Amino acid sequence: MTTIRVKENEPFDVALRRFKRTIEKLGLLTDLRAREFYEKPTAERKRKKAAAVKRNYKRIRAMQLPKKMY
């Protein structure tokens, strides 16, 4: 569980921003959204495989030399 200690004379907005930052760093919101609905194991594997292919394609495109523009 994440706890944030509010310092003396600290505005609420600053404390809320610190809380949101720690939640984001821990990845709790992404995990919560992923577990919101049941996903069949085959659908999960298919989604992860597609993401890996997309990442690989993006990495290859970044390594290629740009085409000459003339």
Swiss-Prot record:
One Pfam family from the record: Ribosomal_S21
GO CC annotation: ribonucleoprotein complex; ribosome
Keywords: Ribonucleoprotein, Ribosomal protein
Membrane-spanning intervals of the chain: none
GO molecular function term, any single one: structural constituent of ribosome
Keyword Ribonucleoprotein annotated: yes
Listed name of the protein: Small ribosomal subunit protein bS21
Originating gene: rpsU
